[in-house]
Regions:
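Short, well-ordered beta-strand segments enriched in hydrophobic/aromatic residues
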Residues: 241-249
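Conserved anchor residues at repeat-unit boundaries in beta-strand-based tandem repeats, strongest
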Residues: 37-48, 64-77, 88-98
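Surface-exposed edge beta-strand/loop patches
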Residues: 185-224, 258-265, 288-332
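Short, solvent-exposed, Trp/other aromatic-anchored flexible loops in extracytoplasmic proteins
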Residues: 158-183, 270-322
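Sec-dependent N-terminal signal peptides of Gram-positive bacterial secreted proteins and lipoproteins
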Residues: 2-22
């Protein structure tokens, strides 16, 4: 009987040694050391490992608590952070920082926004109304589906110095709040998710709508009669392929080069210039006077990331100069 009691006591002591109980400790988090109180699972060295709760203060002195999964003293896995102010964030943590959910992970944000309450999300959109500036920041409305001009989202940015205008493209990371409910201009009821931003930036068209997936520096140049054409680089995106071209006229007359006369062939198929009316890409000048150069972007449909040929037709205003098509074999 005594042996059994001793065994139970030893097991209890071991269990207590592997669990913190309101113990003060310093965690070496990825953004700096934090000293606070920890309760929960620990390893044999007393380091938080498993499920636990850590309470500390930020640099501004505000108290906050993380409760969830720990790995080797770091927030790693599902967790929840609550600030004294009442702010809450829930989600998956990696290296002590919450990981925003985005893309297909938030496709139901606009049908059931209440399911994302306190979740950290990342959205990219276009501002579609005049921003409303207040004492402590700015409120903007964005369409997170830029292509279809849908997915109305209301964003609160607590930074009065942040400059943003109607029709700007923005990237937002923040915490989802209570859905906004109101009426549209026709009296119909609308519901829109709200986000309090922790990260925010103005983007250009390319980064917002067709971000580069892979970029290749090419820098191939061909010259005829002093008229040079250079394929500078290629950018592959999900929605399009961008070819950066430079033309330089050191010839005897005007050099005429039109982007619609630049064609790509790949795997037995021919691709022509694709309209990009909303893009702010630089355009090639058509009729280039002697001694001048021009640079621009020609947009094509989505191509495979495989070798292709681009043929650029051009001519000079000196009809005695017979200029053949500039043909570039692009390999990666």
């Amino acid at each position: 009987m005594k042996k059994r009691i001793m065994a139970i006591l030893m097991a209890s002591c071991l269990a207590l040694s592997l669990a913190g109980c309101g113990k003060e400790m310093t965690l070496n988090l990825s953004y700096g050391d934090r000293t606070g109180t920890y309760s929960g699972d620990v390893d044999e060295n007393g380091v938080p490992n498993g499920q636990g709760k850590f309470t500390t203060t930020n640099d501004a002195g505000e108290k906050w608590t993380y409760e969830g999964a720990f790995v080797n003293g770091h927030f790693e896995g599902e967790g929840k952070t609550t600030w004294k102010s009442g702010q809450i964030e829930i989600g998956t943590y990696k290296d002590d920082v919450i990981v925003p959910i985005k893309g297909k992970e938030i496709k139901t944000l606009y049908t059931t926004p209440e399911n994302f309450l306190h979740r950290c999300v990342e959205v990219v959109g276009v501002v579609f109304a005049a921003p409303e500036y207040v004492d402590d920041g700015v409120c903007i409305q964005i369409m997170a589906d830029i292509k279809n001009h849908e997915n109305n989202t209301i964003v609160y940015i607590h930074d009065k110095d942040f400059e943003v205008d109607n029709e700007d493209y923005v990237r937002i990371v923040g915490i989802v709040g209570e859905p906004f409910k109101g009426e549209n201009a026709l009296g119909g009821e609308i519901t829109a998710p709200t986000i309090t931003a922790s990260e925010y930036e103005v983007l250009d068209y390319k980064d917002a709508v067709a971000p580069t997936l892979k970029e290749y520096e090419i820098n191939q140049t061909q010259t005829q009669y002093g008229y040079s054409v250079t394929v500078q680089k290629i950018e592959f995106a999900e929605e399009e392929t961008r070819v950066y071209i430079k033309a330089d006229n050191q010839g005897s007359d005007t050099f005429n080069l039109y982007s619609f006369n630049a064609k790509i062939t790949q795997n037995g198929k021919q691709y022509e210039e694709q309209d990009a009316w909303d893009a702010d890409y630089p355009k090639l000048q058509d009729d280039l006077l002697k001694g001048n150069s021009t640079e621009g972007v020609i947009v094509y449909p989505t191509l495979e990331e495989k070798p292709f040929t681009i043929t650029v037709e051009a001519y000079s205003s000196n009809y005695e100069e017979e200029i053949k098509p500039y043909t570039f074999n692009i390999e990666f």
